[in-house]
Structure formats: C-alpha cells, structure tokens
Amino acid sequence: MMWRERAEVRIGISGMPGVGKTTLVLKVAELAAKKLRVCGFVTQEVRERGVRIGFDVVDIASGRRTPLARVGTGEPSVGKYVVFLGACSTISEALRGTCDLLIVDEIGAMEFKCPGFGSDLERAVYNSPKVLAVVHRNYTNLAESLGFEILWLTRDNWSTIYNQVVHRLGLA
C-alpha cells in the first residue's frame, strides 16, 4: 500500500495507565510548536474531587475541548465510560488539519467508537510528514500495521523516551 511510505517519522507511545504518555506527547508538542505547525488532538482526564470521571478531547490547533466520555451507563461504552459521539467531529476535524507534526492521543477503543475514525486516522497518517501518537496497549499491532514504531513507556524510562522522540522528530 502506497500510503505507508509517506510519513517520514511515525512514533507510537504505549504503556500502562499513569506512566505519562499524554504528558510526554504534550511536552513534545509544546517544544515542536516553536518551529513546526502542530495539529491533532489529545485526550485528557477529567477529575472530580480527585476521582477520574471521564475524558475530554482537545483539538491542539484550535484549543477546542469537547467531552469524549463520562462514567455512566448507556451506549456506546468502553468499560465504565459512556462515549459521547458528539466528540467525533472534534477528532475528525483535528485529523484533517494540515501540519508538520500530527499528534494523535490516542489510538484506542474510545476513539474507534467514532464512525470513520480508522479511515480518518489512516488518511491523516499518510498526509503528515511526522506523526506522534499515544497507542493503547491493545492497539499496538494496528499501529504497527500503519507503520508506527512503538516505544514502551514506563516511569523509569520516561526521560530516555522523551529525548529519543525529540531527537527522532528533529527537535533536538
């Protein structure tokens, strides 16, 4: 497939919950924004009184924040979270941005509840010269099929992986 040949760099960050995957991606995006056009989206936890109650998706280019999922019952759901399909348009628009570095946080079950996410992701990866994604540990094979090199993040190797990503993206 020709689309696999396009991107110069495709890095996927995976790991267990709470090791700093989103933090790493946000810090790289902040550094990259000094010299590159950055687009895409990040998924951020929403907490209430210290307890995680859900997730919001944030479009990096516009700053638009949209509820993605909350604890509750209903469909579609992922675990204890109900996914709000209204957030799908934010994700889709973020993946259609034109930029030098595409950020995707995350490639995971909630995002795949959005109709068209797979094809939007594939198109965005093809059209972006550099891609940095958070990849849920259950989706690493899929990401590898899109040409991603998967780096496994832990609390112990966070700084090493951060430096490796910065170097690979030409930001050092």
Swiss-Prot record:
Catalytic reaction list: a ribonucleoside 5'-triphosphate + H2O = a ribonucleoside 5'-diphosphate + phosphate + H(+)
Sequence positions that bind ATP: 15-22, 101-108
EC number: 3.6.1.15
Leading EC class: hydrolase
GO MF annotation terms: ATP binding; ATP hydrolysis activity
Database matches in InterPro entries: AAA+_ATPase, Nuc-triphosphatase_THEP1, P-loop_NTPase
Classification via Pfam families: NTPase_1
Record keywords, A-Z: ATP-binding, Hydrolase, Nucleotide-binding
Disulfide-bond pairs as recorded: none
Source organism superkingdom: Archaea
Biological role stated in the UniProt entry: Has nucleotide phosphatase activity towards ATP, GTP, CTP, TTP and UTP. May hydrolyze nucleoside diphosphates with lower efficiency.
Protein family membership: Belongs to the THEP1 NTPase family.
Protein name, UniProt field: Nucleoside-triphosphatase THEP1
Organism (species): Pyrobaculum arsenaticum (strain DSM 13514 / JCM 11321 / PZ6)
